[in-house]
Curated annotation (Swiss-Prot):
Name this polypeptide is given: Ribulose bisphosphate carboxylase large chain
Family: Belongs to the RuBisCO large chain family. Type I subfamily.
Propeptide: 1-2
Disulfide bonds: none
Superkingdom of this protein's organism: Eukaryota
Assembly: Heterohexadecamer of 8 large chains and 8 small chains.
Species of the source: Vicia faba
GO molecular function: monooxygenase activity; ribulose-bisphosphate carboxylase activity
Annotated GO biological process: photorespiration; reductive pentose-phosphate cycle
Role: RuBisCO catalyzes two reactions: the carboxylation of D-ribulose 1,5-bisphosphate, the primary event in carbon dioxide fixation, as well as the oxidative fragmentation of the pentose substrate in the photorespiration process. Both reactions occur simultaneously and in competition at the same active site.
Record-listed N-acetylproline modification sites: P3
The EC number(s) this enzyme carries: 4.1.1.39
Length: 26
């Protein structure tokens, strides 16, 4: 896996977690 893909996946994961928390706790 290239560093670019890894970073994109990490950012996407963090955004997904933030989105999940917002949806779950609101």
């Amino acid at each position: 896996m290239s560093p670019q893909t890894e970073t994109k996946a990490k950012v996407g994961f963090q955004a997904g977690v933030k989105d999940y928390k917002l949806t779950y706790y609101t």
